[in-house]
Amino acid sequence: MPLSKIKTNSLATGSITSAIMPTGSVLQVKFGKFDDDIANTTGTEQDVLSLTITPSSTSNKIYLTSHAQISSITRYHHIKLYRKIGSGSYSQIAFGDNSSETTRQTAWYCCSTGEVTGATYMQTNSAGFFLDEPATTSQFTYKITAGASSSSITGYAFTVNSAHYHGITQAQNQWWNTWPITTLTAMEIAG
């Protein structure tokens, strides 16, 4: 691969401006982590973490990655991704087309341990990836939520960043338990 030359007139006070960066360049990275734990006894959707980012151009895209640690002795759990522009309201993004099967829940990614032997002690590490095209230079916020696949489902308790132990949805300070993190990363990509 040939080397590229940076023109001196492209430099501003010793730095490379984002306007000069080629398409596909990473212009900024925002990272959020949730290093506490959540004990949810009902399965209802719950906020996990959020971050804000302000694109430098309307043509730029935002590449999002996330991984979450969920534990449960039941099933149907997922992560949803939401976006809010400025002080507006959140809208769900990054989900499949359920227009022909409207009973199915929309989600960014699933992270259920399922009802299997030993699921009580399992922590599932699941990940999601998404390229967003917000077409704005306003500040906006991304957030992820965890929950069961229906607001009408109750009793599908889960934990985030902790093992779910025999139906007790609280952090267990035991040698066999771990305390991982759940993350959300947003990268502005030159368009």
Q: What positions do the PLM features span?
A:
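Glycine-rich, low-complexity segments
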Residues: P2-D37, G191
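Tryptophan-centered short beta-strand motifs
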Residues: L3, G24-V26, T42-E45, S89-Q92
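Short, surface-exposed loop/turn motifs at beta-strand boundaries within globular domains
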Residues: G14, S25, T44-Q46, S57-S59, ...
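Terminal beta-strand-rich extracellular "head" domains
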Residues: K33, I38-T41, S56-Q139, K143-G191
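Extended, low-complexity regulatory regions
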Residues: L49-I53
